[in-house]
Amino acid sequence: VIKNAQNTVFSTPKPETVETAAPLSKTDHSSPAKMVKAPKVTEENPFIEGVSPASKKLSKFINLVAPTDMSVLIMGESGTGKEVVAKLIHLKSERRNKPFIAVDCGAIPKEIASSEFFGHIKGSFTGAITDKKGHFEEANGGTIFLDEVGNLSYENQIQLLRALQERRIKPIGSSKEIEVDIRVLAATNEDLLEAVNKGDFREDLYHRLNEFVIKVPSLSERKDDLMIFASYFLEKANEKLRKNVQGFTERA
């Protein structure tokens, strides 16, 4: 079961592959088309496993940590697929049939972060017209993914640390605490250790989040995977545009 913070449930479409190779167009006979079999991925598991040394190392670390319940800090540049890695860790874990809740920490104003993370009860503040479950309660039994965790305010970091230490949350306006059984995955494109040294990120929270660290390689480190990625995106483009482009010329 995969859900994002907006409670969208992703279904699993039937994967398709490109099996054949043909010239790019009828008029281009100078170079044969170059084609690599498109990887089988789904919306539920969009991870593309490459053949480059960097990709193999990434897969090795994912397979190593996924069966455990350790917190994982996923580091990498923007656009390298940190959430995709988090989803794969979840799908390879014992929690695979439980919720996966992805939270963009950078998109949550600090004033409402407590409500977003821990929920609230009706009438607890102006605008609280109904009870609301927070992301932690929604992820109960499963995995919560805290994307761009370095963007949280210092106050919100304190609240998050307490929830992670005690595995209990208290919705705003409630007198009762709720026990939560969750695995925490976090991601950042920042150097959190540098942020700790500057006093912008709590050291105790940093150590709580990085029981295991995975660094997602950049595309420049995965040059051997380029044709695999190209084949995947070509297949998606064919599907969306209703075309039947079969491959790439050697020049391309």
Model-derived regions: residue spans:
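Short, solvent-exposed beta-strand edge segments and adjacent coil->beta transition regions
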Residues: 43-45, 211-214
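Conserved ASCE P-loop NTPase core motifs with emphasis on AAA+ ATPases
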Residues: 1-54, 60
